[in-house]
Amino acid sequence: MGNANIDESDLKILEILKKNARTPYTLIAKELKVSEAAIRKRIEKLIRQGIIKRFTIEYELENEIRAIVMVQSTPQIPTPEISKKIAKIPGVEVVYETTGDYDILVIVRGTNITSINRTIDEIRSIQGVVGTNSTIILRTWF
């Protein structure tokens, strides 16, 4: 990833898109005091460099439960291998490889505690997972 070519304008564009990926290029251009074409070129460059990986949404449904699952793995199986398997499990929203007591942090989503438990059980069944610690998300702030 070529982060060396990132300047303050690129960082500002990323910050705007992070808050709302649907922000029109014209509004970004107005805020940065440049042309819409300049914004379009910068965003295309950020995509090409792999800095912008995807445009997505954050959502929260009523009566939906989200949890953070911290996963300990065994050193005998590479963490990326375990992470890729976890990412394929239904109900898994995102997987992070981390440092500290836990090697992997997983955000899971479900319609009830039973579905959350099912997802956690599936994570625990993956070869190389030696332990988990879970916590329910009460609120999300953006």
UniProtKB/Swiss-Prot annotation:
<dbReference type="GO" id="GO:0019878">
    <property type="term" value="P:lysine biosynthetic process via aminoadipic acid"/>
</dbReference>
<dbReference type="Pfam" id="PF01037">
    <property type="entry name" value="AsnC_trans_reg"/>
</dbReference>
<keyword id="KW-0010">Activator</keyword>
<dbReference type="InterPro" id="IPR011008">
    <property type="entry name" value="Dimeric_a/b-barrel"/>
</dbReference>
<dbReference type="InterPro" id="IPR011991">
    <property type="entry name" value="ArsR-like_HTH"/>
</dbReference>
<keyword id="KW-0963">Cytoplasm</keyword>
<comment type="pathway">
    <text>Amino-acid biosynthesis; L-lysine biosynthesis via AAA pathway [regulation].</text>
</comment>
<feature type="DNA-binding region" description="H-T-H motif">
    <location>
        <begin position="25"/>
        <end position="44"/>
    </location>
</feature>
<dbReference type="Pfam" id="PF13412">
    <property type="entry name" value="HTH_24"/>
</dbReference>
<dbReference type="InterPro" id="IPR053483">
    <property type="entry name" value="HTH-Lysine_Regulator"/>
</dbReference>
<dbReference type="InterPro" id="IPR000485">
    <property type="entry name" value="AsnC-type_HTH_dom"/>
</dbReference>
<dbReference type="InterPro" id="IPR019888">
    <property type="entry name" value="Tscrpt_reg_AsnC-like"/>
</dbReference>
<dbReference type="InterPro" id="IPR050684">
    <property type="entry name" value="HTH-Siroheme_Decarb"/>
</dbReference>
<comment type="subunit">
    <text>Homotetramer.</text>
</comment>
<dbReference type="GO" id="GO:0005737">
    <property type="term" value="C:cytoplasm"/>
</dbReference>
<keyword id="KW-0804">Transcription</keyword>
<dbReference type="InterPro" id="IPR036390">
    <property type="entry name" value="WH_DNA-bd_sf"/>
</dbReference>
<protein>
    <recommendedName>
        <fullName>HTH-type transcriptional regulator LysM</fullName>
    </recommendedName>
</protein>
<keyword id="KW-0805">Transcription regulation</keyword>
<comment type="function">
    <text>In the absence or at low concentrations of lysine, activates the biosynthesis of this amino acid via the alpha-aminoadipate (AAA) pathway.</text>
</comment>
<keyword id="KW-0238">DNA-binding</keyword>
<dbReference type="InterPro" id="IPR036388">
    <property type="entry name" value="WH-like_DNA-bd_sf"/>
</dbReference>
<feature type="domain" description="HTH asnC-type">
    <location>
        <begin position="6"/>
        <end position="69"/>
    </location>
</feature>
<dbReference type="GO" id="GO:0043565">
    <property type="term" value="F:sequence-specific DNA binding"/>
</dbReference>
<dbReference type="InterPro" id="IPR019887">
    <property type="entry name" value="Tscrpt_reg_AsnC/Lrp_C"/>
</dbReference>
